């Protein structure tokens, strides 16, 4: 059956269909409201046990260990680095 597909040839030029792309709405407004909602949620809910443990490691100058812990729990290196930076900024503010 596979060989039968190889013998089929297209005898006319194939053109890409013309599709009009939809314009996206203003992103800045939605982004600002999303950041505001996240900030309010963080302020109300407080720190999770994972964040508390990471902060205790950061206070003890174990940045590497905190990053490894966060990477394991959050799923990626990029997310862990961002969370470590956020928690370090919180420590500096206090």
From Swiss-Prot:
One of its GO terms (molecular function) is structural constituent of ribosome. The keyword Cytoplasm applies. GO terms for cellular component: cytoplasm; ribonucleoprotein complex; ribosome. Residues 1-25 have a biased composition (Basic residues). Pfam families: Ribosomal_L36e. Keywords: Cytoplasm, Ribonucleoprotein, Ribosomal protein. The keyword Flavoprotein does not apply. One of its GO terms (biological process) is translation. It is found in: Cytoplasm. It comes from the Eukaryota. Residues 1-30 are annotated as: Disordered. Belongs to the eukaryotic ribosomal protein eL36 family. Component of the large ribosomal subunit. This is Large ribosomal subunit protein eL36. The lineage of its organism: Eukaryota, Fungi, Fungi incertae sedis, Microsporidia, Unikaryonidae. The gene is RPL36.
């Amino acid at each position: 059956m596979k060989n039968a597909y190889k013998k089929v040839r297209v005898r006319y030029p194939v053109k890409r269909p013309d599709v009009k792309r939809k314009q996206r709405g203003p992103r800045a407004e939605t982004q600002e409201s999303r950041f505001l909602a996240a900030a309010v949620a963080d302020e109300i809910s407080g720190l999770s046990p994972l964040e508390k443990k990471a902060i205790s490691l950061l206070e003890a100058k174990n940045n590497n260990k905190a990053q490894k812990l966060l990477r394991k729990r959050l799923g990626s290196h990029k997310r862990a680095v961002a969370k470590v930076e956020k928690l370090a900024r919180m420590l500096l503010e206090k």
